[in-house]
Amino acid sequence: MSHEEDLIDYSDEELQTTDAAATTATPAANGGQAKKDGELTVTGGRADKKGSYVGIHSTGFRDFLLKGELLRAITDCGFEHPSEVQQVCIPTAILNVDVLCQAKSGLGKTAVFVLTTLHQLEPVPGECSVLVMCHTRELAYQIKNEYARFSKYLPDVKTAVFYGGTPIQKDIEVLSNKDTFPNIIVGTPGRLNALVRDKKLSLRNVKAFVLDECDKMLDQIDMRRDVQEIFRATPTDKQVMMFSATLSQDVRPICKKFMRNPLEVYVDDDTKLTLHGLQQYYIKLSEAEKNRKLNELLDSLEFNQVIIFVKSTIRANELDKLLRECNFPSIAVHSGRYKEFKEFNKRICVATDVFGRGIDIERINLAINYDLPADADSYLHRVGRAGRFGTKGLSISFVSTPEDEQVLKDIEKRFEVALPEYPEEGVDSSTYMA
């Protein structure tokens, strides 16, 4: 496919045509049929020179035949067994096959593309081979840190992160010096497009093009336009991988316009809320009762770290101030301040939805929706902060308005669950504390 004919516009007619073509294409390894493995659905994987779908059920990362340096780093991180999504994606991804993957938060999607691209990478000084884009600076930093810990035994690999809101001249200085020029670039679409447009960044050597939380970028027209322009600046023959915790039927065909017969992996049916080990409850109360109830919960519940979600930056700052006045070790995180919380210097974090997607802090085992989100997908991303990688966790949502009650109904309908009311006697800590 040419960049021009497929990426200029997405009309309804185009999307229907693309979706029809994708669903009628015959995957290389399964005769055109979707492979169902419990609640995991796998389709596709092209049979051209980039390789074909490989089915493998691995019991350890060594089964993937990754570089020895990567295996050492994986061992250092304490990982013994790949998650379900890693078992399905990595063996095929390392063959340079395009990948479209939807899996709930905490199932190890980031490690799929980090390990795949590091395994394939042959670093050349002054050349960018891997380009990873995401929609927030927090997520960009987290991905960069994942590359850092898995590439600790690959000293020639250089990684940099670029995002808006900072002086672009600093980024230009990094790109102008061959000694600091990164082989792997992680960033947000707006800043990366500015660097490409001003000819400060050449993408002619990119071999892997990755979008994390792809639905967030491709849903928004401005961000999607930046992604398109960056995509056009990369070679035609490259691997494309896209990942998200939520991937609606409307967004999937848009994603596939960037790909060639991708391996499609959908872990758990996307109509079901399957955050294993996470206990979920709601509490009906008035707006005026929220602060008292929050204080009661923080006093009575055991937790390692808790994240409290509110609907605006102003409310985050106000609630954080109130909690600190009550001597709770709190910090407000809404656009970039999460290092102190991540390093366990603070146990309570008040956050907005910017923090709800992709941010992975392993000690969080309690999530409280002080303000319920506006939609079901945002609820999934929020409560997914607790109970990462299938560990235990607890989420409690405050329901105080008719709009909240409707969102609660939407959540139950969307994910086919019935959320119970929080019991008056509380809950046993053994049900949510690992």
Curated annotation (Swiss-Prot):
A motif (DECD box) lies at residues 212-215. GO terms for molecular function: ATP binding; ATP hydrolysis activity; mRNA binding; RNA helicase activity. CDD domains: DEADc_DDX39 (cd17950), SF2_C_DEAD (cd18787). It is found in: Nucleus. It is an enzyme of class 3 (hydrolase). One of its GO terms (cellular component) is spliceosomal complex. It comes from the Eukaryota. Keywords: ATP-binding, Helicase, Hydrolase, mRNA processing, mRNA splicing, mRNA transport, Nucleotide-binding, Nucleus, RNA-binding, Spliceosome, Transport. GO terms for biological process: mRNA export from nucleus; mRNA splicing, via spliceosome. The keyword Nucleotide-binding applies. Pfam families: DEAD, Helicase_C. It catalyses: ATP + H2O = ADP + phosphate + H(+). A motif (Q motif) lies at residues 59-87. ATP-binding RNA helicase involved in transcription elongation and required for the export of mRNA out of the nucleus. SUB2 also plays a role in pre-mRNA splicing and spliceosome assembly. May be involved in rDNA and telomeric silencing, and maintenance of genome integrity. This is ATP-dependent RNA helicase sub2. It comes from Emericella nidulans (strain FGSC A4 / ATCC 38163 / CBS 112.46 / NRRL 194 / M139). The gene is sub2.
